[in-house]
Amino acid sequence: SASYASLLKDQNVQPYVRNIAKFAPVPFDNGLALPAKYLVFTRAKAVTLTAQEMTEKVAASTSVFAANGAQTLRFGQIITGNDIGQHLLGVSYQSMSAIEATYDALAQDTNFRQLTAGVEVNMRSIIQLYT
């Protein structure tokens, strides 16, 4: 598209990886209207869990994300590129303190502990958004 071409040419962006993910049906509606300031992406490879089990564990943990400040949450499987078959969790937040509170609470959540025990996390990125 023209927008993508402009991003590469005018903004001097150089993508080093590009993937497409198929999102899983994980209900999440925190209802927060504030604009997100941070995105956290976590990529993981299944070790002992099936894709269905991973989706169920993420879905069972969404209340912990919401209670600690997550604004949006999406989970899916990467279907193109170098990381095909791996899973991606994307969550938006208003602040770094909300990210920290969420991960502190997730460490106590049985479903999330079972999820992390059954996968190999191989990438986590925190991206600050500027508006």
Language-model features, listed with the residues they occupy:
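Short S/T/G/P-rich N-terminal loop/turn motif that feeds into the first structured element of a domain
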Residues: S1-T131
